[in-house]
Amino acid sequence: MKKLLIPLIAAFAANTVSAAAPQQVIDISTDKVSMVLTAAPGGEVYFRHFGGRIDDPAPLADYKSNRRSDHGTEDLAYPATGGRNFREPALRVTHADGDMNTELRYVSHASKQLSDKNVTETVVKMTDCCQALDVELVFTAYARENVITTHAVIRNREKGPVTLHSFYSSSLPLKADKYLLTHLYGAWAREAQVDHTLLTHGSKSIESTREVRTTHTENPAFLLTLNSDSFSETCGEVIAGALAWSGNFRLNFEVDEFDVLTVLAGANPNASEYRLRPGETFTTPEMIYTHSFCGAGGASRNLHDWARNYGVYHGHEAVPTLLNSWEGAYFKFDAKVLKQMIDDAASMGLEMFVLDDGWFGNKYPRNNSNAGLGDWQVNAAKLPEGIDHIASYAHSKGLKFGIWIEPEMVNPKSELAEKHPDWIVRPPKREAPTTRNQWLLDLTNPKVQDFVF
């Protein structure tokens, strides 16, 4: 009996030590900002902190939340449908065998400094506890700019295809007494209207379902002022986020019964199911975060610095001042009118002239918005000597020359639409939807890609 008790006691002690073992700390930091995750002994990966820099995040290994797992409100780093998660998930899939549950468990993490010593990349690897589905959370920290970007990589190792229903780029839990959400909305001729909303319990979404573009109706970016119901450019704690994605997007803000705010950010799940074949990976868009104790101005300056250094092509080059032909001439111009505009631009010390809409189309001249779009030949009636003549004239006056195109769109009244009706995006057995007298070209068609690019 004593021989039997010894291994039983040893096994019980081992299990007790394992259950009480501290969580692994995953520290992602810049000069002034820290994002801290922990991996629990059971494999769950939690978000523990995003805000001001923590020089020693080790104590977070012993963090104990008052939020209970049986309430489905734990601060999982990438919550999925299934298990005890009852909130909107960052990941919702149907596995190859029809199973709709996913419970991600920690595998490993690693950080490395990139060739640019200012940039550190951290990859957290997780896998489903029962299915051959892997998720990597990739965090890139920009030290001087105090910006951290993140995206997810989903890999299918199952025997059949997996259907992705929701695949957000990021899930970010925050704890504060108050949350003031600031974002931009608008419409034509009144873009970038500022909206301030004090978040209460429940969910609020900022989203677009306008397909291939972000819009002036809603922007995929936000500011969150913490612990205050007043907005300030100069003081207060502020988190800023922006999604690097030009299609349908969704930013969801959910305040639960414990006053914890979870921000889900990424591609809009609406009509976005993706079939991931065995062996394939899917990479979500990048989500960009920063934090400031100096109000919205501090957060926006962090993003400005990051954009100039990393986010914008030739970000440190001076942008030329320019005159665009649109507001001055609309569709009604010829070479004489354009030359006069170039002369005026040069006399004012401007640096570039841009020829806007109306320069193309012959069978269907682009004299209004109803015709010619897609027929990218120079309109011989307006510009008999061609665009080269206008560009050379601009150069002779010391100006750069630019030109406007909208290659993804086509007018129904155009040679392109007549010759290639199969290039138009249209639902089966239905007419192609028309917006602003335009149809959309199918950019997934290789022939369209060759034409456009």
Q: How would you name each of these model-derived features?
A:
Residues 14-18:
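N-terminal signal peptide c-region/cleavage motif recognized by signal peptidases
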Residues 20-25, 257-277:
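Short acidic, Pro/Gly- and aromatic-enriched capping/linker segments at domain boundaries
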Residues 21-28, 33-36, 44-254, 270:
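Polysaccharide-binding surfaces and accessory modules of carbohydrate-active proteins
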Residues 99-106, 274-293:
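Short Pro-Gly-centered flexible turn/kink motifs
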Residues 142, 286-320, 327:
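Terminal connector regions
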Residues 314-453:
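Aromatic-lined carbohydrate-binding/catalytic grooves of carbohydrate-active enzymes
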